């Protein structure tokens, strides 16, 4: 009996060690996600290993939440930065939305999971069309998840992008968009998209000098080595918005 228990414990330990090894591999792949990229497209083999390893690590209850967070985060990264054919987009977005929703239901207090879910749900709703998204309650769900997670970037974008529709969608408010996007930048000045989204709002407000100032501030931050692809694309968006504003000013 004693020998049996020792053997059983040994197998259990091996299982936990294997799962934790999967987590270690996955984290290493995530850290190296920009290596061997072509342009702003990540290496597909590394991304697949990262996703598969996080999924395997989820079997270890002791690291399940951390592994689940890594899993949905890596799926979101792959959707944004790994090349796939255009006809695959709908299936991949459907999968990202479903998986992140399940993860959010299990770990509703995890802010990283909530951010991915709100972002995926927002993109999913946008693909279905604004009216359908509103009727099915997708827009309100995005807002509610963002509020719970204090995700000011997603919340501010929702207030800015979504149309005010009396009796149907009465909560979008561009004054609140200003409040939340400003908060997002204040709380995380390292994320270039916080400069970009607030600059877009300033453009909409015809505050061109303020928009250009935000763009300059964002571009001056350079590129973070641990967010290389994300910041590289963020800089591209900032420069494109800068061109758009300058072209508008040149016409005056």
Report residues per predicted region:
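Sec-dependent N-terminal signal peptides
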Residues: 4-13
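Short coil/linker segments at helix-helix boundaries
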Residues: 28-52, 73-109, 116-147, 155-186, ...
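Short helix-capping/linker turns of helical repeat alpha-solenoids
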Residues: 61-64, 109, 190
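Canonical tetratricopeptide repeat
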Residues: 70-71, 116, 154, 197, ...
């Amino acid at each position: 009996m004693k020998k049996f228990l020792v053997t059983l414990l040994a197998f259990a330990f091996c299982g936990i060690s294997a799962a934790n090894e999967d987590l270690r591999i996955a984290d290493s792949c995530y850290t190296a996600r920009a290596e061997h990229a072509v342009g702003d497209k990540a290496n597909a083999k590394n991304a697949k290993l990262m996703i598969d390893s996080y999924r395997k690590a989820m079997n270890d209850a002791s690291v399940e939440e951390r592994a689940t967070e890594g899993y949905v985060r890596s799926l979101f990264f792959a959707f944004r930065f790994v090349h796939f054919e255009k006809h695959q987009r709908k299936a991949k977005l459907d999968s990202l939305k479903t998986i992140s929703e399940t993860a959010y239901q299990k770990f509703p207090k995890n802010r990283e999971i909530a951010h991915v879910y709100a972002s995926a749900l927002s993109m999913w709703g946008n693909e279905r069309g604004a009216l359908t998204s509103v009727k099915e309650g997708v827009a309100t769900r995005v807002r509610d998840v963002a509020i719970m997670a204090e995700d000011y970037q997603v919340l501010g974008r929702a207030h800015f992008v979504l149309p005010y529709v009396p009796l149907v969608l009465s909560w979008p408010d561009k004054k609140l968009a200003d409040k939340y996007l400003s908060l997002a930048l204040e709380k995380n000045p390292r994320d270039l998209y916080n400069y970009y989204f607030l600059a877009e709002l300033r453009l909409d407000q015809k505050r061109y000098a303020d928009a250009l100032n935000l763009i300059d501030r964002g571009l001056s931050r350079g590129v973070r080595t641990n967010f290389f692809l994300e910041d590289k694309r963020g800089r591209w968006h900032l420069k494109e918005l800068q061109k758009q504003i300058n072209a508008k000013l040149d016409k005056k």
